[in-house]
């Protein structure tokens, strides 16, 4: 079929917009920006460039799957609405859904020279009012239990925005609570899931196609995501996915993890499936957006990926963003090391005693920080390249075996530093007992495989997809 703008949809996620009104240049914003993979200080500039790109594409609608703002600041929401209004003036229908950063956020801040100060956030009711034209006002069907809604921006195509956030559990001292607490995990309320499946079933019964979006992942984008990064995938995700499939939802756009990745989840007998199309953060390298074209002949959605390459005040946007990812390696190392240390650390005394039996000497780490430094010394290079591969998508196009072998060499060097006199025996133990458990996860990440080495294994093309409707 000949494509047209009337059946084109653009998808972006996690723009994390920080209003310029919240920033007075100085050391406060510089310090905050320096530790981010997100290009926070350039978020307004990037959103300006994205808006120009979207207007040039002239899609029927734009889906934004959450984390519209940096930390839920009211002024940032108001700034985002200005950009959406500009798109709307060109006949484009923006549609939004909140992310975990967007409502009831105790971390809302403004940056004033060398000071970081509290800023006003928004309630869920205020969010709905601000975005009344983009999901929550007249002409939209609302779920009474959440910020979920549905609409039909293209004739015969129903969009369902699903609220997967838990910010109703947040507490804010600015509102009289005793402490500030914040929840970034995902959960769909039972009554909301019931509402969503009813809407989807009705749409399918009427011969309409259904596309969903929400902030958190629905499918695991790598093996054991629900264990290693549980806050990035909705609770009870398999059951939720099965119910959505049964209701006729086969494509859902998500965000949250800031990676451009796709994963397919099947029902038990592989007769039905749902594709979770994750889109990376609009203000993180490689600055991805999705362009989806409806195909009536195949009843599918043809999804391609594009990248923003520059912004008015940041002509070297991609290189700056790439360096941010590399600079984040120490933080990733600390995160991974702490997860391992939480399990191994309490037994380190016993391990040390066992390895030093017979007079052997060891240099075992005694703290989580020392463990992190050990990992960083030997694995920083391979971790940086792996992070770049993951955020860029289509990791299988890279030299996976080279990365895996480099990682093994780094682990061997770690063992030799920590326990030089026992290195051969420990290396043998790693190869025979530890690595077989790690390998499915490693290959799942680096080869875009899910359910590795099982009868449900799938492999995705992260950047170019044909999604059935």
Task: Name each model feature, range by range.
Residues 1-7, 315-469:
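Non-catalytic terminal accessory segments
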Residues 1-77:
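N-terminal active-site segment of His-dependent metallophosphoesterases
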Residues 6-20, 32, 156-172, 213, ...:
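Active-site-proximal beta-strand elements of phosphoester/diester hydrolases
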Residues 16-46, 72, 113, 168-188, ...:
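Acidic/histidine-rich helix-loop elements
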Residues 18-21, 70-72, 100-108, 167-170, ...:
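Active-site environment of divalent metal-dependent phosphoester hydrolases
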Residues 54-61, 93, 158-160, 174-275, ...:
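His/acidic metal-ligating clusters that form di-metal
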Residues 79-201, 270, 291, 301:
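Extended active-site neighborhood of metal-dependent phosphoesterases/phosphodiesterases
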